[in-house]
Structure formats: C-alpha cells, structure tokens
Amino acid sequence: STLLASSAASDVYKRQPKDLLDFLSIYKENSVCYLERVNGMTGQSASASFVFGEGYGQLTMGLIACGIPTVTVSPQIWQKAFGLRNTDKLSKTEWKNTLKKKAQQLFPYAKVTLATSDALLICEYGRIKEKE
C-alpha cells in the first residue's frame, strides 16, 4: 500500500489542478493519505491565505475524486507521537529546524529540507498508524 502525506498545500497550487489529479490517479489503488488539519496561516496576508486554502481545497477534492481515503491529523497529534512539542515557544525557524532534525534521524538517506520535513513526519506517523 502507498502512504501519501501532505502537511501543507503549498506545492499543490503551483501546479494545474489537472496535474494534481493525474498524479493522485497513479496512487489511487491501496493508498491512504494522512493530511494535516490546518486552519489559517497566522501572519500571512489575505491573498497568501487564499492561495493556500485554494491549494488545500484542490488537494482535498483530488483525493475525493480519486477515492483515496484521507485521515486528517492535527499537528499536535502527529508531533506528540514523535515526542515533539514546542513548549519552549521556539521561533518558526527554530521549530522547523527541530522538525527537520527529527526527520533526518528517521530518514537518514533522504534529502530532508525545511519544506519536506513536516510531510515526511506525517507520512511516518501514518505508516505507524496503518500498522496498528
């Protein structure tokens, strides 16, 4: 089975919706998507929030159209599963670096970036949950 994970829709809106649908169609058999439950993006402009929401909506509809089961998970839940909690009130960059470090520990042979660490951790969370 295939696990798909997305912690943000930021990459989705950079593509055409048809491209996303074509991509998801490849993985529609025996797949499940773990998708981070998101609210607004604090500190972002209205237009940036709109674009983010549009991409998130396209992703959600693509998953529905392809019949890929989707599990939404809050950041607190998947982060807690790895013993990660931002109790020190780290800056956004410091927190992203913490997530990246954890993803690098779990995936030593992958090229982990600040942009991909959330998705890798959510995917790993999903893999663990699917085994239960």
What are these model-derived regions, one by one?
Residues 17-29:
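Short amphipathic alpha-helices and their capping/turn segments at secondary-structure boundaries
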